[in-house]
UniProtKB/Swiss-Prot annotation:
Protein's UniProt name: Kynureninase
Annotated HAMAP family: Kynureninase
CC annotations in GO: cytoplasm
Species for this entry: Pyricularia oryzae (strain 70-15 / ATCC MYA-4617 / FGSC 8958)
Assembly and oligomerization: Homodimer.
MF terms (GO), sorted A to Z: kynureninase activity; pyridoxal phosphate binding
Source species, domain of life: Eukaryota
Biased composition (Polar residues): 75-86
Gene that specifies this protein: BNA5
Biological classification of the source: Eukaryota, Fungi, Dikarya, Ascomycota, Pezizomycotina
E.C. no: 3.7.1.3
One Pfam family cited in the UniProt record for this chain: Aminotran_5
Needed co-factor(s): pyridoxal 5'-phosphate
Signal sequence bounds: none
Enzyme class: hydrolase
Region (Disordered): 59-86
Length: 497
């Protein structure tokens, strides 16, 4: 398993320091040459500067120049690299993996295998697994993806369910784990969850006959958009007797702050509070140990750092203590036929025979196309380890921070005394243990769209969150030091012009 592979990357010192020549492209390239997992980049298809401007399908993949090669043929340009100025083969600088990851090259093979199976044997694909196919039989694909996800989230396969999408899974988990009473009815969350979480939490509180004004406790940040662990623990203590559920993001999507999940979980559970984590921005980004941390439940999407494709099927974790199916240990849930034990599922019995573990929460037959795409993504992810990805991520993110701070120093030197605010500030914690692969850059008011458009024109893709935040995410699976240098260079030119 990937989790047992020897770690290759060195853990950076604290604080992370860079030499005087670190602001040069030559330095970035020299670091790429030394990176022990640089080969992972070759497993992905990068948009090119030309393909980003496409207006219609043309039957060609990025990095295949017109009149030269189509998918399945041989192209001279190696994807993700280019030594020319030809936009057709020059890869974009893609720093948007925290919103949507790049397409793995394996995805097309896995989906084509699914389509061929369906076309060739129809319904028999539910129970047929071919030796030369990358796929299991359809009824076993979700369990296979769960097994491949085990090292990603730090859980046993039986504690993982691959199903639905993130917000749907949040509702299914809350149906079981948010059981408010007159005494314990509050949910502790944070001030700015991803809006879908906000809507789900509010609707669950209202569904149970309570009011968000009295049943929702929001953790607010300081003036630097930082929520300290001490504040979280103090809030738990303050509301312990009236709180039914603590529901926080592993990484705050807007600021990029990574929370101390094991400490917060232990503190809340010691107070009798159920603990759930939204891992949308943490899964595939930072190492996780959900079982060992004693988390009650967690949910995540798979289209960001796991690269399973837009709107891809999601995942849920349920700790093994909640997965018992005997009459005394059974956890109430909203049930459906695909949560029924596989051995008896097709008996079509009237009584529900739940699958032990998290897969007993599955309701419907999951999409085979979705599972093929996720299986492809996980097959690539597991070529390395969460530990090695994290170590490279620490270096890449620190390098991006170093170069961004260089812009601020140069700007301050050139505009001393003009009274202008700096063009931006980084609101993600500078402590490497309190962030993942994302740096959130809060731009001066009115700059976001102007800067974003200039960067896009330069072939750089970053995520913009109105009104003023640009999220810069060097993904260690496929981004390089040179990518970091080019991204920050484009940002420098945009804000200094």
């Amino acid at each position: 398993m990937a989790a047992t592979q020897k770690s290759l990357c060195a853990i950076p010192a604290d604080p992370i320091e860079f030499p005087a020549d670190a602001n040069t492209l030559d330095y970035a390239r020299s670091e790429d040459a030394k990176c022990p997992i640089r080969h992972m980049r070759e497993h992905f298809i990068f948009p090119t500067r030309a393909s980003l401007k496409k207006k219609a399908l043309d039957g060609r993949l990025p990095a295949y120049p017109p009149n030269h090669a189509k998918p399945g043929e041989t192209a001279t340009a190696q994807n993700g690299t280019s030594n020319t100025n030809d936009d057709n083969v020059t890869p974009a600088v893609y720093f948007c993996g925290n919103s949507l990851g790049l397409q793995p090259k394996a995805t097309r093979d896995h989906i084509n295998a699914q389509l061929e199976t369906w076309a060739s044997i129809g319904v028999h694909g539910h129970f047929t697994s071919w030796d030369n196919s990358p796929l299991k039989s359809w009824q076993d694909m979700a369990a296979d993806c769960a097994a491949q996800s085990a090292s990603v989230v730090g859980a046993s396969p039986d504690e993982i369910a691959i199903m639905n999408t993130l917000t749907a899974n949040l509702h299914f988990m809350m149906a079981s784990f948010y059981r408010p009473t007159e005494k314990r009815h509050k949910i502790i969350s944070e001030w700015k969850p991803f809006p879908s979480d906000t809507y789900a939490i509010a609707s669950q509180i209202q569904w149970h006959g309570f009011d968000t004004a009295t049943s929702l406790v929001e953790l607010h940040p300081d003036e630097n958009y930082y929520i300290s662990t001490e504040k979280i623990l103090a809030t738990i203590d303050e509301h312990a007797e009236s709180t039914a559920l603590l529901l926080l993001p592993g990484i705050q999507y807007w600021s990029g702050q990574l929370f101390d999940m094991p400490l917060i979980t232990a503190h809340a559970r010691a107070k009798g509070i159920v603990v759930g984590w939204d891992l949308a921005h943490a899964v595939g980004n930072v190492p996780l140990s959900l079982h060992d941390w004693d988390v009650d439940f967690a949910i995540w999407c798979t289209y960001k750092y796991l690269n399973a494709g837009p709107g891809a099927i999601a995942g849920a974790f349920v700790h093994e203590r909640h997965g018992k199916v005997d009459s005394d240990g059974f956890k109430l849930r909203l049930s459906g036929w695909y949560g029924n034990n596989k051995a008896t599922r097709f008996n079509m019995a009237k009584d529900f025979d739940p699958t032990p573990g998290a897969q007993g929460w599955v309701v419907s037959n999951p999409s085979g196309i979705d599972l093929a795409s996720l299986g492809a993504a996980l097959s690539v992810y597991n070529l390395t380890t969460p530990a090695d990805l994290r170590k490279k991520s620490l270096w890449l993110t620190a390098y991006a921070e170093h170069l961004l701070n260089g812009i601020l120093k140069d700007e301050a030197a050139s505009s001393a005394g003009d009274g202008k605010k700096p063009a931006f500030r980084i609101i993600t914690p500078s402590n490497k243990n309190e962030r993942g692969a994302q740096l959130s850059v809060l731009l001066r008011e009115g700059l976001l769209d102007v800067v974003g458009e200039k960067m896009e024109a330069a072939g750089v893709v970053c995520d913009r969150r109105k009104p003023d935040v640009m999220r810069v995410a060097p993904v260690p699976m496929y981004n390089s030091y040179e990518d970091v240098w080019r991204c920050v260079d484009a940002l420098r030119k945009a804000v200094m012009s």
